[in-house]
A protein has these predicted regions:
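Short, small-residue-biased leader/transition segments that mark boundaries at the very start
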Residues: 1-8
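Extended, charge-enriched "interface" segments that sit outside catalytic cores
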Residues: 36, 42, 48, 53-58, ...
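A structural-propensity feature for long, helix-poor, extended segments
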Residues: 10-43, 54
Length: 229
């Protein structure tokens, strides 16, 4: 309404709620379940501050003090992840720690980042057997909050990157606009149900059209041919 950036489905649950109400409509009270969101790994509880604090600060809902705390946490998380990426560990250095977890021993040296991708391996445990990690965390003053966030980012990196890739593909569809006065009934290649739903809801973009119940992937391909890939 005011020309600002939209709150979209992969950024917050309120984005899911608004998009559902606009594209799907309701015939009963709407309940916001996590199952309604297709990007649940991106919309985790633990990263809510990382996702939403910048936007909250931008529109004046976040105090300077809280924003400064957020920036400090973000910096600590990035520092710890970067440290894990560049530091290598020898098999002998963490042999006893892995044995205590009943985890497969290393056969050769590995980056700390790779070791942390194992289920039971934690920064908290590793710093007890790696003096240089403990020293770094003390020097930089890594908080428990930052340590937890860094660990989650490392362990779930593959899943997070896959969801981001899917979300970015769908974002491209959001950039393909449909004229407000377009006559969907003029397109015989669309199914009758799709023509009816599209004419009623009148989505502004192909991305929104793709989320309307009754509009199939084949219908979306027809729209892509018409309005450009």
């Amino acid at each position: 309404l005011v020309g600002s950036e939209m709150c979209i489905r992969d950024r917050a649950y309120i984005g899911v709620l608004i998009d559902d109400l606009v594209t799907k409509g309701v015939d009963e009270p709407y309940r916001m379940f996590t199952s309604r969101a297709e990007y649940r790994i991106l919309l985790r509880q633990d990263n809510a501050d990382m996702r939403l604090t910048p936007k909250g600060y931008e529109i004046g809902l976040i105090s300077e003090e809280r924003y400064a705390h957020f920036l400090q946490k973000k910096s600590l998380v990035e520092s710890l992840v970067a440290f894990a990426r560049r530091q290598s560990v020898k098999a002998s250095e963490i042999e006893s720690y892995l044995k205590s977890l009943n985890s497969e021993p290393l056969t050769q040296g590995r980056k700390l980042y790779e070791v942390l991708m194992r289920n039971d391996v934690t920064f908290r445990g590793l710093k007890e057997v790696l003096p240089r990690l403990r020293r770094f965390m003390e020097e930089v003053a890594i908080t428990d909050e930052a340590m937890e966030e860094a660990e989650i980012q490392i362990k779930y990196k593959g899943y997070i990157e896959r969801e981001k890739f899917i979300a970015e593909k769908l974002h491209r569809l959001e950039n393909i606009r449909i004229p407000a006065d377009f006559d969907f009934f003029s397109m015989n290649s669309l199914t009758i149900e799709a023509r009816q739903k599209l004419s009623k809801i009148r989505p502004e973009t192909i991305g929104r059209a793709s989320r309307i119940p009754g509009v199939s992937p084949a219908d979306i391909n027809v729209l892509l041919v018409k309005f450009g890939r």
